[in-house]
C-alpha cells in the first residue's frame, strides 16, 4: 500500500512533525481530515478495500493528538452485512458502499464523531464512472486548490478538476461532461451517517433515502447542511408530481434522525443548488438558484 503521512507545521513555521499512518494491509481511498479543536485531535478517515479494485470493506480511522503531536489510536471498522443493508436496498450487499464518497465529519462534545458520505455515480452513453478509475490518483484531487476536499469546490467523484461544470449551468451545453462524451447522467443518492465513539468504534448507521438525477450538469443535485445547538440539518431539492420542494432531515445531538416539514417552492422556472448552500445564521442559509440564464440567491430559514 502507498505510504500515507500526517504533517504538522507549527504556526511559527519553526517546527515540522511527520507522523506515518502505518497500514500494511488496507488500501485507503478518499482520505479526509477533520481537526477537532475542542478535543485537541486530528481525525483522519478513509474508506478502504483489501484488494486493489475490490469492494469497499469498511472505514479506517486514525486519530492524532495535537498536544503530544503523536498518534492516539487507529481503528478499522469492517462493515457487516447488517451495516451494508442499512445503506442500500440491493440484494447484493457486497458493493453496498462502493458508490459512497466521504463528505464531512461532525465532531461531538463527548469525543465521538459522525462520518457523512453520499452515494454518487455518473453514466454516459458509453460507460459508467468507477471509483477505481483514479485509485491512488484521487478522483477528488485538484492541484490548484489547497482545500480541494471542501464543498462546493469538488465533492463528486467525476469532478476531475475540482468541480463538475463551474461555468456552464445549461444542460444543453457541456462539451466536457464525463471527458468528452456527448450525454452524461449524474446521480446523487442516499446519504449515509456513520457514528463512531471516542475510540473510533462504529456505534450506529442511519440513512437519508433520496434519489436525484440530472443531465450533463451536477449543480442541481446533492445537499447542503446547517449546524446549530440542536444538531445538523440536511437540505436537498426534490421534484415529485410537478411540485418542487426542499426536503429537510435533522440529525439531533442524541443521534435521532427526524424529518421536518418540506419547504414548497412555488416559483416557476427556478432551479435550486442545495449543495452550494451557505449557512449565515443559526437557522438561516443562503441558497443559490438559476432563473433562466441568471444566477440569484435566496435566504431560507430552517425551523
Predicted regions and their residues:
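Short beta-strand elements that form the blades of beta-propeller/WD-repeat-like
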Residues: 1, 40-52, 103, 111-123, ...
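Intrinsic-disorder/low-complexity signal
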Residues: 56, 96, 125-129, 144, ...
Amino acid at each position: 500500500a502507498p505510504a500515507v503521512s500526517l504533517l504538522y507545521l507549527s504556526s511559527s513555521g519553526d517546527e515540522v512533525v511527520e507522523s506515518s499512518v502505518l497500514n500494511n494491509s488496507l488500501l485507503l481511498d478518499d482520505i479526509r481530515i477533520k481537526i477537532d479543536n475542542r478535543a485537541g485531535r486530528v481525525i483522519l478517515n478513509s474508506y478502504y478495500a483489501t484488494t486493489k479494485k475490490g469492494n469497499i470493506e469498511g472505514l479506517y480511522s486514525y486519530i492524532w493528538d495535537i498536544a503530544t503531536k503523536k498518534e492516539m489510536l487507529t481503528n478499522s471498522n469492517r462493515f457487516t452485512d447488517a451495516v451494508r443493508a442499512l445503506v442500500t436496498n440491493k440484494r447484493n450487499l457486497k458493493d453496498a458502499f462502493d458508490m459512497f464518497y466521504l463528505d464531512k465529519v461532525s465532531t461531538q462534545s463527548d469525543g465521538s464523531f459522525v462520518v457523512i458520505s453520499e452515494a454518487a455515480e455518473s453514466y454516459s452513453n458509453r460507460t459508467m464512472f468507477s471509483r477505481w478509475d483514479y485509485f491512488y490518483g484521487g478522483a477528488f484531487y485538484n492541484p490548484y486548490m489547497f482545500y480541494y476536499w471542501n464543498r462546493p469546490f469538488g465533492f463528486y467523484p467525476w469532478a476531475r478538476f475540482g468541480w463538475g461544470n463551474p461555468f456552464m449551468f445549461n444542460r444543453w451545453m457541456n462539451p466536457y461532461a464525463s471527458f468528452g462524451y456527448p450525454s452524461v447522467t449524474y446521480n446523487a443518492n442516499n446519504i449515509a451517517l456513520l457514528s463512531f465513539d471516542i475510540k473510533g468504534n462504529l456505534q450506529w448507521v442511519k440513512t437519508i433515502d433520496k434519489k436525484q438525477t440530472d443531465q450533463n450538469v451536477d449543480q442541481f443535485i446533492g445537499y447542503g447542511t446547517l449546524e446549530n445547538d440542536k444538531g445538523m440539518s440536511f437540505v436537498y431539492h426534490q421534484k415529485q408530481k410537478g411540485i418542487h420542494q426542499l426536503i429537510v432531515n435533522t440529525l439531533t445531538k442524541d443521534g435521532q434522525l427526524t424529518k421536518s416539514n418540506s419547504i414548497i417552492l412555488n416559483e416557476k422556472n427556478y432551479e435550486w443548488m442545495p449543495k452550494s448552500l451557505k449557512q449565515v445564521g443559526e437557522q438561516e442559509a443562503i441558497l443559490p438558484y438559476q432563473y433562466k440564464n441568471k444566477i440569484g440567491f435566496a435566504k431560507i430559514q430552517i425551523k
